Amino acid sequence: MLNEREKILLKTLVERYIHEGQPVGSRSLAKFSGLDLSPATIRNVMTDLEEMGYVSSPHTSAGRMPTTLGYRFFVDTLLVVKSLDNEQITLLENQLHPNNPTHLMNVTSRLLSELTRFVGVVVTPKRMGGAVFRHIEFVALTEKRILLILVTPEGDVQNRIILTETAYSQSDLIEAGNFLNQHYAGCTLEEIRSGLQRELTQLRRDMTGLMNAAIEIGNDALQESSEAVVIAGEHRLFDVRDLSDNLSSLKSLFEMFERKSKLLQLMELSRQAHGVKIFIGGESDETMLEEVSVVTAPYEMEGKIVGTVGVIGPRRMAYERIIPIVDITAKLLSSNLS
């Protein structure tokens, strides 16, 4: 645990590094920390922080810069979030109209990019994810093509063709439908998918092959209710010095933007949070994101989480400004969709 002096100096170092983009030396820390300490004493504290993994010292400079661990401690413990000014709030309120959901998602990602000067991301609601089902049925079309029939409480019928890697018999499919109808009728497809993932984790060892097949068929079906990722402002990353100097990192990021599946997996994690969630560098376990941070927040429709909004930028971002932008955008989007 850091003592108060270490916290103040780490906070000052992160803030100066975010502001200046250069390793921070002891004289700068003495000037901006408000502590009456000599440069020698500050250097000793920096050595301690470096040994604990909160800061690092590049070979070309006598100053220090925050590590991922340093950023994480700063964000979780030391950060003071700023309120959005009235002009920014008014802009969001005026632009986020619920008239056209697809247009609304495009506008949201664009506004996030414009307000932060980084990349704005919106994961749109699943086409079928919010539907409550009364009855599900699977019909074999060919060996690995299955027709999913979903009936809502209102009597609406939705059909979807599923391509599976495993061949299932019609009796397997009937058993799968019976299992889902018995255990999950009245749930949304999103709730079913979460439940099936738990079933796969908890019951796989003692489940019969047939029940295993039933759950996997259901999981295949629900995974097919695809989401879309709306991205705006990718070009802004070329203006970020921390990233533009590293072409291989930029290339990896743009590959992720193009494929979107990796980004979707990351954004999916924020559904489990009740507010803003922040991934810093390698915390996401995704090598493409080692040089960036992702700030996300879930949004709702009729009280259920249906998607996420987020901003992708350098680790050296003004978190105190980005966090409220993402947070308020998610809340306004929820309000307009409901």
Swiss-Prot record:
An example Gene Ontology biological process: negative regulation of DNA-templated transcription
UniProt entry keywords in alphabetical sequence:
Repressor, Stress response, Transcription, Transcription regulation
InterPro entries the UniProt entry points to:
GAF-like_dom_sf (IPR029016), HrcA (IPR002571), HrcA_C (IPR021153), WH-like_DNA-bd_sf (IPR036388), WH_DNA-bd_sf (IPR036390), WHTH_HrcA_DNA-bd (IPR005104), WHTH_transcript_rep_HrcA_IDD (IPR023120)
Example of a GO MF term: DNA binding
Which Pfam family is one of this chain's hits?
A: HrcA_DNA-bdg
Q: Does the keyword Ion transport apply?
A: no
Q: What does this protein do?
A: Negative regulator of class I heat shock genes (grpE-dnaK-dnaJ and groELS operons). Prevents heat-shock induction of these operons.
Q: Which family does it belong to?
A: Belongs to the HrcA family.
The protein, known as? Heat-inducible transcription repressor HrcA
Organism listed in the record: Nitrosomonas europaea (strain ATCC 19718 / CIP 103999 / KCTC 2705 / NBRC 14298)
Lineage here is: Bacteria, Pseudomonadati, Pseudomonadota, Betaproteobacteria, Nitrosomonadales
Q: Which gene encodes it?
A: hrcA
